[in-house]
Amino acid sequence: PMTSSGAIDYDAYGRLIDWQIESGVAGLVTCGTTGEASTMTAEEHRQTIAFAVKRAAGRVPVIAGTGANCTEKAVELTRFACAAGADACLVVTPYYNKATQRGLIAHYTAIADASDKPVILYNVPSRTGCNLLPETCAALAGHPRIVAVKEASGNISQIVSLFHKAEAHLDVYSGNDDQIVPILAMGGEGCISVLSNVLPKEAVRLCELFFSGDVRGAAALQCRLLPVIDALFSEVNPIPVKAALAKMGYGTDTLRLPLTPMEEGRRAVLLNALKAWGV
């Protein structure tokens, strides 16, 4: 969350962290896509990681977003996160420069070599212009500190191939809230969720239903949540989630350019969808 002047609102962020933990989430990700890391300065990025680790105080694991499109920068940030006490690092594929698959292997290997904590690969080609292929994940799975992948390609055929080629060596987490149950059904371990920012108990419940064996119940809950999920992605993430959190008392809907506040018509749809869940 940010103040109306665009400064990071650590009071609101601390309260958000506490609420997430009290709602039963299994872990926290700081400085990811939803955390607006792309518009933070290097110092803010470090401060926010350190703050999240301190605020969580060991209650749940903290995963730090440490990706960059420069390998050296990603290595430096990963080393900082490890030293600051993060439990793992979430590393998005390099964006804009569009590395080859061979380049991705070299990039992630360098980061994992520099880390003393587990590394989670993050594939979101719609945002990065770079697709981490299943065979590349399988190759990277041989590194002892590369343990999982957040899969947000949205391509179910590719995700099936990922399970076929790499599941034995990598945990797979859903990175798309509308595909949580399908990915869990293929063997996924959980989700790294945007939805959980605003409905954490429901996101936790969805996974609990699935892992308790109530697959139909989990699927039904996923379908009931779709109006909220769709509204949260009706504009580029994190624009809608920040609008929702501002309404809930966690900071303002201020974003740093080039992101701008949510269009009023879409905001109304989002807030109306949340009302159905008592928000």
Regions found by a protein language model. Give the residues of each.
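Active-site beta->alpha loop and helix N-cap motifs at the rims of alpha/beta catalytic domains
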Residues: P1-G129
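Catalytic alpha/beta core domains of metabolic enzymes, predominantly
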Residues: D113-A114, R127-F233
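A general structural signal for well-ordered alpha-helical segments in protein cores
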Residues: Y13, H45, I49, A74, ...
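Glycine-rich phosphate-binding "P-loop"
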Residues: N123, R145-I146, R256-L257
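Glycine-rich, flexible loop/turn motifs
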Residues: S4, E36, S126-T128, A152, ...
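Short secondary-structure transition/capping segments
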Residues: M40-E43, V75-E76, Q101-L104, L132-P134, ...
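Alpha-helical structural signal in soluble globular domains
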Residues: S23, Q47, F51-A56, F80, ...
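C-terminal alpha-helical cap/extension of soluble enzyme domains
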Residues: P1, W19, S23-V25, A185-G188, ...
